[in-house]
Swiss-Prot record:
Keywords: Cell inner membrane, Cell membrane, Membrane, Transmembrane, Transmembrane helix. Belongs to the YciB family. It is a multi-pass membrane protein. NCBIfam families: PRK00259.1-3 (NF001325). Plays a role in cell envelope biogenesis, maintenance of cell envelope integrity and membrane homeostasis. PANTHER family: INNER MEMBRANE-SPANNING PROTEIN YCIB, INTRACELLULAR SEPTATION PROTEIN A-RELATED. It comes from the Bacteria. The chain crosses the membrane at residues 19-39, 47-67, 82-102, 105-122, 147-167, 177-197. This is Inner membrane-spanning protein YciB. One of its GO terms (cellular component) is plasma membrane.
Amino acid sequence: MKLLYDLLPVILFFLAYKFYGALPPEWILAVGVWLPVALEPDNPGHAIYLATAVAMVVMAVQLALGLAIKRRLETMPLLTAAVILVLGGATLWLHDPVFILWKPTLVNWLFALVFMAPPLFGRRTLVETLMGHALSVPRAIWSRVNLAWVVFFLVSGLANLFVAYTFSEAVWVDFKLFGMLGMTFVFVIGQAVYLGLHHREDDPHTTKGDPS
């Protein structure tokens, strides 16, 4: 359920884009009143603007709910929201989809920085911090997995740019949901297998429960 909640902005972006032409014209015109771009129901090129606005609203609502319920905002969702709101706003104000096309790339590269930062300052890797309570593996393995995440995020960002600038906008919208979700799923499965191979119960040389 949490995965679906986290993916909600991406899913609704996809649906708003794909079904733009099927929406009642009066709905589109009503939404356009609130946007800096005047939406034209018979203009397929405006689908990206409606989709962007939908994603921005959903992300803002999620942030507000998270703050109201948990009284705090987690780093990753906050970074994602900041990028969506800034680039989405630029897309709408400047009437240029190129900004929202860069959103997955910037989010992935920011995540890469987040995963890189702790070891650079002599701290535990983020992967170990998040999963060390559940798995006992050597610290060297945590470092490799953390590095793998950094590489994955960098490659994902490059893949997004390749698709965005090589194929049509419609293909990019498909890739944004299915391609990136598929890449992430395969990577997570591979990580789980790798960690499972190195997991050792009650091994004194592992890091489970190590507070350092």
